[in-house]
Each structure stands twice: as structure tokens, then as C-alpha cells.
Amino acid sequence: MSQNHRILLLNGPNLNLLGKREPGIYGSKTLDEIVADLKHNAIELGVTLEHLQSNAEHELVSRIHQAMGQVDYIIINPAAFTHTSVAIRDALLGVAIPFIEVHLSNVHAREPFRHHSYLSDVAKGVICGLGADGYQFALTAAVHQLRAA
């Protein structure tokens, strides 16, 4: 492979509490464990994976802006911002970097307010309800799409 693709992983609010917060819904793996596994798999796939978790919407928006021209694909678990953030949607549309939306839980089987996403209709794909494995599936899909382009 002649090009080392760069993938940005973004995680939204409260995901820093994974492993402690409602493990029956979100699983027992910590975010650090999930990211370490992803970085290991990224190396095996020959891509670079960068990560940011933030509880602040503006930090996620700023990182998306910084990704323009620097990142080839975004994997994002916007967490609660899924249901509220026009700003993140507009940032993703503004940089025109393809992205996959990931959720650990099946948001469609939860409270009605979690059923709507401001990102799903503009994402390349959405993975939900598969726990931490969803991140791995998203990474694999992103790499396949980049190599097919």
C-alpha cells in the first residue's frame, strides 16, 4: 500500500466513564481498552488511528475542523450529542470527510429521545448495538472503503 491512511476516532460525552457507567448497557471495557485494541488493529491494517474523547461539543467540532486535509476517514461515537448537535453535523458536512457513526448500545431499543440522530442521514454507515465490537467493524469498513477508492 503506497498511502498510509489516517483515521480519526472521536468519542463524545461520558464515554470516558465506560467500564464504570451502566455496564449492563455499555459493557465492561473501558474506553482506554477499546482504543488500545483499535490502535493495535489499525497498525495491523496499515493505517494510522488518532483519538479524541471530549465531553465538550466545541472541542469535537474544533477537532473535526482540524481534520480537513489531514484525515481520510472519521469514526465517531457522538454519544448524547447524537440527539442534539447540529454543530457536529455541520462540522462533518463542512469538512466533507466520510464518517461512520458508532453506538455501543442499540439506541433504537432505548428511550424515544435516543431514536433520532442528527448524523445518521449523512453518515456512510451507522453501527449500533454491537458493543465495543462496533468500533472494530467501523475500522474495518473504513479501511475497506479507503482502499476501494
Swiss-Prot record:
GO biological process: any one? amino acid biosynthetic process
The pathway is: Metabolic intermediate biosynthesis; chorismate biosynthesis; chorismate from D-erythrose 4-phosphate and phosphoenolpyruvate: step 3/7
User: Which InterPro entries does the UniProt record give?
Assistant: DHquinase_II, DHquinase_II_CS, DHquinase_II_sf
Sites binding substrate sit at 77, 83, 90, 104-105, 114
Reaction(s) the record says it catalyses: 3-dehydroquinate = 3-dehydroshikimate + H2O
Q: Where is the active site?
A: 26, 103
Q: What is its EC number?
A: 4.2.1.10
The annotated site for Transition state stabilizer falls at: 21
Q: What class of enzyme is it?
A: lyase
Q: Which keywords describe this protein according to UniProt?
A: Amino-acid biosynthesis, Aromatic amino acid biosynthesis, Lyase
Gene Ontology molecular-function annotations: 3-dehydroquinate dehydratase activity
Q: What does this protein do?
A: Catalyzes a trans-dehydration via an enolate intermediate.
Entry's HAMAP family?
AroQ
Its family?
Belongs to the type-II 3-dehydroquinase family.
Subunit comment for this entry?
Homododecamer.
- Name of protein: 3-dehydroquinate dehydratase
Species the sequence originates in: Aeromonas salmonicida (strain A449)
